[in-house]
Amino acid sequence: MTNQDPDDGAYPSSQSDDDGIEALAINRQSRPLLAYEDQAAGQSDAFTDRDIPASTAPLTGRRRTPLSWTEVIWVSLTLLLIAVLGYSSQLYVMLPYYEKTPSFSPQALAAVLVPFNLGLLAIYYNYWLCVTTDAGSVPAGWQPEWSALEPVASLAELEHLHLVAEEEPSLELKQAIYRPRYCKTCSAFKPPRSHHCKTCQRCVLRMDHHCPWLANCVGHFNHAHFIRFLFYVDVTCLYHLIMISCRVLDSFNSYTYWREPCARELVWLVVNYALCIPVILLVGIFSLYHFYCLAVNQTTIESWEKDRTATMIRRGRVRKVKYPYDLGLWRNVRQVLGASPLVWCLPGAGARMAGDGLKYPVANGLDSGSQYRWPPKDPSRPHPSRRTWASSSSPFTYPERSNPILDPTLSTRFPHNSSPSSSDSHSSLHLPHPPSLLDPLPHHFDPPHDPDTQPVNCPKRVSVRRGSEGYEVRPHTPWSV
């Protein structure tokens, strides 16, 4: 279950990547200036110098913080489930069956139980790594690569920006500068693929989701352990299901008659079937999804971002953009599980994933700055800093005519030299606020006034009733005598 902050940009309705920071202007030296929403809190000078070097490597190679009592309960339940499935099937099903079946030799028993116990050992070890390994935190003072945030523009576009900046130095040019990802909860920049987890109360590197069964976030430094844990759970549960089914079918008995299980065996067979079948179905489906994410090099949150981006492209809000982290099947798997296929399934192999979690390789044909520009922002979403809020003394949340939800799409416009009380009115389209960048019309657009055209006095429009099929219904009139 994912449990990240809704303000983090992971959900389609989130806006955290736009919160806290936005590009404001280009000065005469053509250097972007950054402004924060928390300047009033005394942080106006924080992280504005582009010459400050990036921070050191992230916090790695350390254990996570101690478990809380609720996390201890989740971990204990998980370990109890593994123990019940793993050991009850051996102690109360397979060993009694071995004792009363002469044809079931010790070599055959060892050939059945040794692989099963190796699978259990791999499950326990990978689960311990998932719980105790820190997913990765953003180092204090980290800053993005500022040169990668500036869009690649042609010479003509650059000359135009210089001319505009010289004429109006304070003109807002947000389209010319990309906003870096910023976490308003942590008051810090966010590296690519990192998100804020409100359960862990921090930004996690390459966050996939927060798993309550692990009592930990699945992130950059424990993602490989999580994939191996799912793999061994699937393989061992399937082996467990085949093993107890062989007992039910009496497959190890070379005699002709079937040896019926006793009452205790029957009870534990039912318990093992009741627990193993739901686990292998639920974890199996969950594993298939994460194996697919591994093949395309995406996280659970990034799959939501890709769906949101596809929706914006389909509606014409943004241009078609390529997902920057899909390197191909071979490179995608190597980036998570390690360089050699011989250690992909080895528990604990590749304890440290490739890279530091702050910067990632991108697909062919893309520049390194594409990872800082993913996911694309929705241009139709109003930025929170551009809203007009009422003063603290006002009892209303929005001042008059500033609520964006109640902004009508149609309004009445009056011609020049006329008052709103005049009976002569013209209806025209009222463009939504703010106007689209592709629309050449201004926000308040009135039709041009022709002085040679005399206004025509038209009577007021009479309200007309219409039936369910759209036909006009005459109003009721009194009976005439």
Swiss-Prot record:
Segments of this protein annotated with the region Disordered: 1-22, 370-481
Entry's free-text remark on domains: The DHHC domain is required for palmitoyltransferase activity.
Coiled-coil ranges per UniProt: none
Organism classification: Eukaryota, Fungi, Dikarya, Basidiomycota, Ustilaginomycotina
Keywords linked to the UniProt accession: Acyltransferase, Endoplasmic reticulum, Lipoprotein, Membrane, Palmitate, Transferase, Transmembrane, Transmembrane helix
Family listed: Belongs to the DHHC palmitoyltransferase family. PFA4 subfamily.
Pfam families assigned to the protein according to its UniProt record, in alphabetical order: DHHC
Topology with respect to the bilayer: Multi-pass membrane protein
Sequence ranges on the Lumenal membrane side: 88-108, 245-265
Gene Ontology biological process terms in this record: protein targeting to membrane
EC numbers, comma separated: 2.3.1.225
Protein name per the record: Palmitoyltransferase PFA4
Superkingdom per UniProt: Eukaryota
Any single Gene Ontology cellular-component annotation: Golgi apparatus
Residue positions of the active site: 211
DHHC domain boundaries: 181-231
Low complexity: compositionally biased ranges: 418-431
Gene Ontology molecular function: any one: protein-cysteine S-palmitoyltransferase activity
InterPro entries in the record: Palmitoyltrfase_DHHC, PFA4, PFA4/ZDH16/20/ERF2-like
Reaction(s) the record says it catalyses: L-cysteinyl-[protein] + hexadecanoyl-CoA = S-hexadecanoyl-L-cysteinyl-[protein] + CoA
Name of the encoding gene: PFA4
Cytoplasmic side, ranges: 1-66, 130-223, 287-481
Purpose of the protein: Mediates the reversible addition of palmitate to target proteins, thereby regulating their membrane association and biological function.
Biased composition (Basic and acidic residues): 441-452, 466-475
Compartmental location: Endoplasmic reticulum membrane
